[in-house]
Amino acid sequence: AITREPIKKAGEAKELEAVAEVIYGGFDNDPFQEKTYINTADGKERLVLFPARRNGTISGVAIKTSTNKGFGGKMELIVGFFLDGTVSGYKVIHSNETPGLGTKISEPRFKEQFAGIRPKKHLFKVKQDGGEIDAVTAATISSRAVIDAIQKAYDAYNKFSTGI
């Protein structure tokens, strides 16, 4: 019980650092203090939504999302969005992917494919599945998992953005 609070604080610091990394242009509020929860489209999960503000106006949103479709099981990401729903970036905050293979989902060469796109199901798949995303070599399952998590976040963002 003595270690629970420091572990929680370390996790929050890691999440806030990830939010800062995926929100283009920064923010002047504390997105962690303003966080809210939003249900996934199927209603089975609650995602954490961090609004980023500049001069009191929402300038972007970061969403903590997850998937159980990783090669190593559960994977958690923070995904950033511009107000038009375009992905600004993502950061993996937890995964059990294979070192040197699945962990390449965190490398710029793979991540850069997502920046500036608005996910649409018909193209938001790895090329092996008829989409436009180059999977990490020998880590197609991990690549698909990232897409699944980002798609969940995107669907939640679209639900949230109707209220902006």
Ranges and model annotations:
Residues A1-I164:
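Flexible, solvent-exposed loop/hinge segments and secondary-structure transition points
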